[in-house]
From Swiss-Prot:
GO cellular component, one term: plasma membrane
Name used for this protein in its record: Putative transport protein YidE
HAMAP family noted in UniProt: YidE (MF_01016)
GO BP terms in the entry: potassium ion transport
Record keywords: Cell membrane, Membrane, Repeat, Transmembrane, Transmembrane helix, Transport
The UniProt record lists the keyword Transmembrane helix: yes
Length: 553
């Protein structure tokens, strides 16, 4: 068998063994995709014992390409929400998550200086302790750029594997410990979250209001500031028994019922100006109006602002809200449409059908992947990651590398959405498939390279010490920030658990947090809020640590 055939066969075996290990769960928690790393270590041990020779060049290419696929698809997935998560709505959660990253870096630096841990080893421990595989790839990339021998670079994968198991268990232990320390009643926390969940004003709500302010009588909607802005949408108006779709020129009268869509704070302001909330239904049932959800798939409308499409003037149809990448938004007239946006339309059936034709609404297109934008994005990301930045006093030029470059480019392209007829939307199933393929390839090679000396290092070497160092890097930031968030910020326990899981970019921890109260979405919401920024910082941090440690010796 040729070296290439043998290498591919061994990688396939690693994937099978690793995915099987990852699917084994104890009380609902398993290693997940991290099991591939340990599958690689097991197979790598026996490959080394058997004296087999694999193609090192091929393994290197597969490892790097897998990493590129993984970080690129992550960037495309979180891009639409990345910059939004930096705004005020998620500022507090993101600040606590960033603090966890910073404390983890400080603990790593202290351990490195106190115990004289080799640079590749301490970076591997750091990456494993925070269960972040892209951080491992980014660290290995910068070490190679700094001229570190390959044998030393491979040690990073081994120390990563030592620290990884407690990285998963440590966050679960932290959640349990904080629950005991603060005597948390999970049911009470869930009820409190449900009663106050505004996510900084990010959730979209509807309200029916009766016009009671005499100053508004016989005014057109466009002349009422609270209704003429982009924060509140009036999608229906009921006068006596007639339900209609209002336009900016529609004149409102005392006693009219308005169906408003917006964020809770904005709806409250509208209520103060217009009148009291009423329980009267403004349902379209039994009327000549209906509500429909339509998907944007027509390339001709991509990048166009809602106001420029003139749906209200041409078709008497109102867009009441917009869903982008799972996030509900008020359909502001200044919003530019992106491929895959889901619009809530209110209007007559024939008019809605006409608008749907303009927008596309071709469900089959959502399952298709445009491969040209994928490779354009990957290519641009690799180029971005290869740009050297020379800083006086540093031994090597700083680069984003094959982990940082594709990630940042994907974040930017995911946020832009489309350029002309090129759109970077990727169906969730396709995104997940490419992401899983990439991480399986990457971890398979890392495990194979680490497997030969893993047992020896664990039993006869410094493996146990590495596990201890990793436990400190995992536990100290989580416990510290968890206590601060609960005591100082009075953060909801379920929200805090999601934030802790997101700060470690750890899906098994999110699964555990979700199971604390299966019907509450608090943990998932906070996890999604901090995940994009933290993923970016986790990839950049080992590179900064590597250059810092290298420069100060």
């Amino acid at each position: 068998m040729s070296d290439i055939a043998l290498t591919v066969s061994i990688l396939a075996l690693v994937a099978v063994v690793g995915l099987f290990i990852g699917n084994v769960k104890f009380r609902g928690v398993g290693l997940g995709i991290g099991g591939v790393l340990f599958g690689g270590i097991i197979v790598g041990h026996f490959v080394s014992q058997a004296g087999m020779t694999l193609s090192s060049d091929m393994l290197h290419v597969i490892q790097e390409f897998g990493l590129i696929l993984f970080v690129y698809t992550i960037g495309i997935q979180v891009g639409p929400g990345f910059f939004a998560s930096l705004r005020v709505s998620g500022l507090r959660l993101n600040l606590f998550a960033v603090l966890i990253v910073i404390i983890g870096g400080l603990v790593t630096a202290i351990l490195h200086k106190l115990f004289d841990i080799p640079l590749p080893v301490v970076l591997g421990i750091f990456s494993g302790a925070v269960t972040n595989t892209p951080a491992l790839g980014a660290g290995q990339q910068i070490l190679r750029d700094l001229g570190t021998p390959m044998a030393m670079v491979d040690q990073m994968g081994m120390s990563y594997a030592m620290a990884y198991p407690f990285g998963i268990c440590g966050i679960l232990f932290t959640m349990w410990m904080l629950r005991v320390i603060f005597r948390v009643n999970v049911e009470t926390e869930a009820q409190q979250h449900e009663s106050t969940r505004t996510n900084g004003g990010a959730l979209i709500r509807t309200i029916n209001i009766r016009v009671e302010n005499p100053n508004l009588h016989n005014l057109a909607i466009k002349d009422v500031p609270i209704l003429n802005g982009d924060k509140v949408i009036c999608s229906r108006l009921k006068r006596e028994e007639t339900l209609k779709v209002p336009s900016p020129e529609t004149v409102i009268q005392l006693g009219d019922l308005l169906h408003l869509v917006g964020q809770p704070a904005d709806l409250h302001n509208a209520q103060l100006v217009i009148g009291q909330e009423v329980d009267t239904s403004l349902s379209t049932k039994g009327t000549d109006l209906r509500v429909a959800r339509v998907v944007v798939t027509n390339e001709n409308v991509l990048g166009k602002r809602i106001r420029d499409l003139h749906f209200k003037e041409r078709y008497d149809v109102v867009i009441s809200r917009l869903n982008r990448a799972g996030v509900e938004l008020v359909a502001s007239s200044d919003i530019s449409l992106q491929f895959g946006d889901i619009l809530n339309l209110v209007g007559r059936p024939s008019a809605i059908d006409a608008v749907a034709n303009v927008l596309g609404n071709a469900q089959q297109k959502l399952q298709q992947v445009q491969m040209l934008p994928v490779f354009i994005g990957i290519g641009l990301g690799v180029l971005l990651g290869s740009i050297p930045v020379f800083v006086p006093g540093f031994p090597a030029a700083l680069k984003l590398g094959l982990a940082g470059g594709p990630l940042i480019m994907a974040l930017i392209l995911g946020r832009i959405g489309s350029i002309g007829k090129l759109y970077w939307f990727m169906p969730p199933s396709a995104n997940l498939a490419l992401r899983e393929l990439g991480i399986v390839l990457f971890l398979s090679v890392v495990g194979l390279k680490s497997g030969g000396d893993f047992i020896h290092t664990l039993v006869d070497g410094e493996g146990l010490s590495w596990i201890g160092y990793g436990a400190l890097i995992t536990a100290v930031p989580l416990i510290t920030v968890g206590i601060l968030a609960r005591m100082l910020a009075k953060m909801n326990y379920l929200t805090m658990c999601g934030m802790l899981a997101g700060s470690m970019t750890d899906p098994p921890a999110l699964a555990f947090a979700n199971n604390l109260h299966p019907t509450s979405g608090a943990a998932a919401l906070s996890y999604a809020t901090v995940y994009p920024l933290v993923m970016f910082l986790r990839i950049i941090t080992p590179q900064l640590l590597a250059v810092l440690f290298w420069s100060i010796g």
